[in-house]
C-alpha cells in the first residue's frame, strides 16, 4: 500500500507542535557589545579592589588568578587582561559577584553617612552642651555623661584658645565607639 499525498504531510515534524521554550530570542550585535563592555567594566572594578575586599567576592580560582595577574600588570597588558576577564565573566553567572560588589560599596557609603552624623552630633555637643548630651543619652543610654561634659568643656577651651581640636577628636572617637558597640 502506498502513501497518499495527504498522509505524508502527517510525518512533517513541527507543524502541529507549538513550544514556547524553543522560541529564538533575537539579540542585536550592539546589545551583545554593550553587555560585553559592561562586564569588562565590572571586571575592571573588581581588579581595582584591594586584597581584603577581593576576598569578600565569590570568585572561582581561574577568575581570581586572572584578576590577581591584572593587578600586577601595567599599561597595554592590563587592557588585554581586562578583556580576558570580561570574556571569563561572560561565561559565568555574575549576579552573585555584582551583589557582593554592591554590598561592599554600600557598606562604605553607610560608614561615610554615619561619620557625617557623628561629626554633626559632635559639633552640636560643643555648641549646645547639656541639651545635646540629653540627645546622646537618648541614643545611647550607657554613655558616660561626666566624660562627655569633660570632653565638651575641654573642646570649648581649645576652640577659644585657637588650639588644636584634640578634645573634639576625642568626642568623635567616643561617639564612634558608642555607635559601634550598639550595632
Curated annotation (Swiss-Prot):
Predominant location category: cytoplasm
One annotated Gene Ontology cellular component of this protein: cytosol
Biological process, per Gene Ontology: assembly of large subunit precursor of preribosome
Keyword DNA-binding (UniProt): no
Keyword terms of this UniProt record: Cytoplasm, Ribosome biogenesis, RNA-binding, rRNA-binding
MF terms (GO), sorted A to Z: ribosome binding; rRNA binding
InterPro entries: DarP, DarP_sf
Domain of life: Bacteria
Location within or outside the cell: Cytoplasm
Biological role stated in the UniProt entry: Member of a network of 50S ribosomal subunit biogenesis factors which assembles along the 30S-50S interface, preventing incorrect 23S rRNA structures from forming. Promotes peptidyl transferase center (PTC) maturation.
Family the entry assigns: Belongs to the DarP family.
Stated name of the protein: Dual-action ribosomal maturation protein DarP
Amino acid at each position: 500500500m502506498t502513501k497518499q499525498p495527504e498522509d505524508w504531510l502527517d510525518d512533517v515534524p513541527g507543524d502541529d507542535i507549538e513550544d514556547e521554550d524553543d522560541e529564538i530570542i533575537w539579540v542585536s550585535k550592539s546589545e551583545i557589545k554593550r553587555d560585553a563592555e559592561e562586564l569588562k567594566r565590572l571586571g575592571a572594578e573588581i581588579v581595582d579592589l584591594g586584597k581584603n575586599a577581593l576576598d569578600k567576592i565569590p570568585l572561582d580560582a581561574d577568575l581570581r588568578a586572572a584578576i590577581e595577574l591584572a593587578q600586577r600588570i601595567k599599561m597595554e597588558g592590563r587592557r588585554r587582561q581586562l578583556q580576558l576577564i570580561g570574556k571569563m565573566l561572560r561565561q559565568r553567572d555574575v549576579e552573585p559577584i555584582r551583589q557582593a560588589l554592591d554590598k561592599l560599596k554600600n557598606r562604605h557609603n553607610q560608614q561615610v553617612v554615619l561619620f557625617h552624623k557623628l561629626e554633626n552630633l559632635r559639633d552640636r555637643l560643643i555648641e549646645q552642651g547639656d541639651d545635646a548630651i540629653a540627645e546622646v543619652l537618648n541614643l545611647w543610654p550607657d554613655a558616660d555623661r561626666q566624660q562627655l561634659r569633660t570632653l565638651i568643656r575641654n573642646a570649648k577651651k581649645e576652640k577659644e584658645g585657637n588650639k588644636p581640636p584634640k578634645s573634639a577628636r576625642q568626642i568623635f572617637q567616643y561617639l564612634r565607639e558608642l555607635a559601634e558597640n550598639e550595632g
